[in-house]
Curated annotation (Swiss-Prot):
It comes from Arabidopsis thaliana (Mouse-ear cress). Highly expressed in siliques and at lower levels in roots, leaves and flowers. This is Inositol diphosphatase DSP1. Signal peptide: none annotated. The record marks 156 as: Transition state stabilizer. It catalyses: 5-diphospho-1D-myo-inositol 1,2,3,4,6-pentakisphosphate + H2O = 1D-myo-inositol hexakisphosphate + phosphate + H(+); 1,5-bis(diphospho)-1D-myo-inositol 2,3,4,6-tetrakisphosphate + H2O = 1-diphospho-1D-myo-inositol 2,3,4,5,6-pentakisphosphate + phosphate + 2 H(+); 3,5-bis(diphospho)-1D-myo-inositol 1,2,4,6-tetrakisphosphate + H2O = 3-diphospho-1D-myo-inositol 1,2,4,5,6-pentakisphosphate + phosphate + 2 H(+); 6-diphospho-1D-myo-inositol pentakisphosphate + H2O = 1D-myo-inositol hexakisphosphate + phosphate + H(+). Its EC number is 3.6.1.52.
Amino acid sequence: MKLVEKTTTTEQDNGEDFCRTIIEVSEVNRNVFQAPGGEADPFRVVSGEELHLIPPLNFSMVDNGIFRSGFPDSANFSFLQTLGLRSIIYLCPEPYPESNLQFLKSNGIRLFQFGIEGNKEPFVNIPDHKIRMALKVLLDEKNHPVLIHCKRGKHRTGCLVGCLRKLQKWCLTSIFDEYQRFAAAKARVSDQRFMEIFDVSSFSHIPMSFSCSIR
């Protein structure tokens, strides 16, 4: 089996460019990817004799058993299966698409939805209580491996990850650097202010498996 990693640049609808990493697995035995009972797995993306593993937009590992990304679509399902996910934390208010729900059901993945509006206004308040509820789910190792995502994987996802970093005792400079790496030119002062004043004193437990904590 040979892994070939390709990075491509694609233009989004709004004119911005983003990078996707496509991992091609050559010489794949298709029988390996059959569902129980011998039926073909409908969520595997196979072209010829190659299996294409395409991460979602803005995909990255946050910590042991924690991942982040933009909204995954059917092209990303094969890649997500390799993560062995138990849970997804979804931070948008819109209903989850039926195709995504079917993917979760077929893979035994639990969905936690904390609907946060995707406001573009600079001074709109982020709902503190929803971030807290999402953070509690995130800290529970029974839910790992877990994927956090919103629409683009920038602002709402960035705020939740930033609050996790604060709990891990990261300095604000490092928290903001990570946030800005994903938000880029779309970084919002209101998001960074929210992370700065977010009170983590009510959270007393950080799983020992977390590798990015300052202990």
